[in-house]
């Protein structure tokens, strides 16, 4: 077989579980080894893996802001950011290799179920700007949300801005006004979970959470594939 990440050839080892689930292994041993699942202890707010269960530096900064203390309940992520996930994210996010998303379906569902206990949550993928969506042809956050198996709504509209990756960290951390909202009735008094590919400083998630809370959401949490 050919590994879907490194594209190297390998001999697959089938198990009764993989046969019954019709979920054959499509990753080589080396790539599996470098998939770094986030394990406790973690930051209780953003889910970053660390040596203790106290708030990390970024989350401490968010808690100091009066407009952010009650906006986001928590974030949880599946994998830590490393060289392998950098390559995966690039292929998935920028080259449209959406088949990679299916590789993570089992882990995504397991971590989501373990992290969120509310009944009938609404998933809201972080949107792309119209320009970015036209350029890529798909929104990776919508694809990730579809793996979870809960209702999906798309009431947020991204306002075109310069790329987050080109901004300094303090500029990203304190940015506002990235989104507008439509169709607010569907989220009033609902538990909302934002879905995105990666959580970095939290600026994108917090800004989306703020506007959803202002529109009447009961609570807002977030779930990402990767925590950097």
Which residues fall in each region the model found?
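Glycine-rich phosphate/pyrophosphate-handling loop used in enzymes and phosphotransfer proteins
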Residues: 1-228
